[in-house]
Amino acid sequence: MKSKVVIFDTTLRDGEQALQASLSVKEKLQIALSLEKCGIDILEIGFPVSSPGDFKSVQTISKNIKNSRICSLARCIEKDIDAAGEAMSSSDSFRIHIFLATSTLHMESKLKKNFNEIIDMAVFSVKKALRYTDDIEFSCEDATRTTMDNLCRIVETLIKSGVKTINIPDTVGYTVPNELSCIIKNLFERVPNIHKSIISVHCHDDLGMAVGNSISAIQAGARQIEGTINGIGERAGNTALEEIIMAIKVREDILSVSTNINYKEIYRTSKIVSQICNMPIPSNKAIVGSNAFAHSSGIHQDGVLKNRKNYEIMEPSSIGLKEVKLNLTSRSGRAAVKHYMDEMGYNNSDYNIDELYTAFLKLADKKGQVFDYDLEALAFINKQQDEWEYFSLKFFSVQSISNSLSTASVKLLCGKKTYTESSTTSNGPVDAIYQALNRIACFPIILQKFQLVAKGKGKDALGQVDILVEHKKRKFHGVGLATDIIEASAQAMINVLNNIWKAKQVNKKLKILKDFKKK
């Protein structure tokens, strides 16, 4: 039977330290509930003594979390431990996490204490915390730069004092996998009562090795891993929990351990943390990045279409990702283009794959990424993108008439002759201009995604707006780029409207062809 690895999440404590602004109590609770649904064992939800707001958030979360065990941080100071115990008092079971530096550097330059004093402080604090709960975790801060003799000595003493979990933090992300493995193995060999406690590791990513170090610790005997969702945290961040969790699952053949995680909640939880914390996920981020299951190379796409296991070591659905598509770019091959046409229900006899692929490559070189509706237009209208811009924005103005209301006026070229003007009042300038544009186009759409990315710095910086809308159960993309955010937003919507119009022209032509065949 595989042994369990306890997953300890510190997104709401260590992770929040990386944010430019503190989260509200409501936002923290939303993240905590998502983590609980994901099956996280331990939730470190704050540092209660640090501020009244943090104390309140720990109190609130303690009342609402039922399945995960909650935990809060405290220094080896009485008021810290009291604050932690009182803030979590409404919970049936909780953990107090105490920490104290043990490295010579920290003892001498930061704490101004010798090692005997450090041990006395640690033991006193553990006794104080045991008045509130029997679940105590102790972190030897900067453990990976602590001498092995001192580390073994304090760990043995702490376990005798009643500590159930001993955490070995790589506080500054200094260690490497083999070194951390040796530290853990040394503890198991030299500390006689080590098996009375769970050994944990808390790795930072300053050298980009947090996940690798955590894996090596598991192989050496550690049975609790601490980290954060998306790896957010102080400086370069922490161990990314979604990565360590999936590494345990995918490589259970060599790690021989398991977790209690609900894997299908990983992607959703990652997105919630990203959105609430306002920290975008890099596209190349392992497990949850937008490119994690994307394939652009023609060779890879062909291999995936034949068998996904050729280029995917896990199924996207295993983390709760429902829809995964091949990216159509200039690197895509015929197999990917044909796959998209098949997915849309077209037969080989409906179009010429050679002609379509040639036209596709020209468009991909010009546009970058090509979508399904682009392929339809190439196959059945056979014109390049710049030839089918039905809508063109000639003029727009937006005025704010109050704190929340804006009015927009637009002049839109529809086809080659018709100019139309429209104005509307709505909540915010972008919404106002979108309503004005769509009042002219008359396409029923639902905005599903609006993303703004800055390109460059200073007054000459460009704003790129990416939007995704749904029209009659089909998704359409649009991109706008301008120094003015409102203009970029308008361009993105014009892009969408042209894509919808283009799809409608395809449908009209296909209907004519279908009626002709019937005759």
Swiss-Prot record:
Reported cofactor(s): Mn(2+)
Signal sequence region: none
Pathway(s) annotated for this protein in UniProt: Amino-acid biosynthesis; L-leucine biosynthesis; L-leucine from 3-methyl-2-oxobutanoate: step 1/4
Keyword rRNA-binding: no
Lineage top rank: taxon: Bacteria
Catalytic activity: 3-methyl-2-oxobutanoate + acetyl-CoA + H2O = (2S)-2-isopropylmalate + CoA + H(+)
Record-stated family: Belongs to the alpha-IPM synthase/homocitrate synthase family. LeuA type 1 subfamily.
Protein's UniProt name: 2-isopropylmalate synthase
Species whose genome carries this gene: Buchnera aphidicola subsp. Acyrthosiphon pisum (strain APS) (Acyrthosiphon pisum symbiotic bacterium)
Record gene name: leuA
